[in-house]
Design a protein with these regions (language model features):
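Short alpha-helical "recognition helix" segments of helix-turn-helix
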Residues: 20-21, 50
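Recognition helix of helix-turn-helix/homeodomain-like DNA-binding domains
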Residues: 26-40
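Short, charged recognition helix plus adjacent turn
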Residues: 8, 33, 62-67
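Residues within the alpha-helical elements of helix-turn-helix
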Residues: 12, 23, 53
Length: 67
C-alpha cells in the first residue's frame, strides 16, 4: 500500500494547505485530498509542484508498506 506523508512534511515545515496552494498554483481542494490521503490516482504534475514548493524529494511524500 502506498500512503502520502504530505501532512507530516507540511506540519514539519509549518506550511498550511492554503499557503501550499499559493506556492504551487494547485487548487486547495486538490491539495486537500493529497493532505488527507484520500486521493485515488497520483498526478505526477501535482507531486512535482509539491516537491518543488516544499523543497523535498518524492520519497519524502510517499511511503510504501506491505499489506
Amino acid at each position: 500500500m502506498i500512503t502520502l506523508t504530505l501532512k507530516e512534511v507540511m506540519d514539519k515545515q509549518g506550511v498550511t494547505r492554503y499557503r501550499l496552494s499559493q506556492l504551487t498554483g494547485i487548487q486547495y481542494a486538490i491539495l486537500d485530498k493529497y493532505y488527507k490521503n484520500t486521493v485515488i490516482r497520483y498526478d505526477s504534475y501535482v507531486l512535482d509542484r509539491i516537491c518543488t514548493a516544499l523543497n523535498c524529494d518524492i520519497a519524502d511524500l510517499l511511503k510504501h508498506t506491505k499489506s
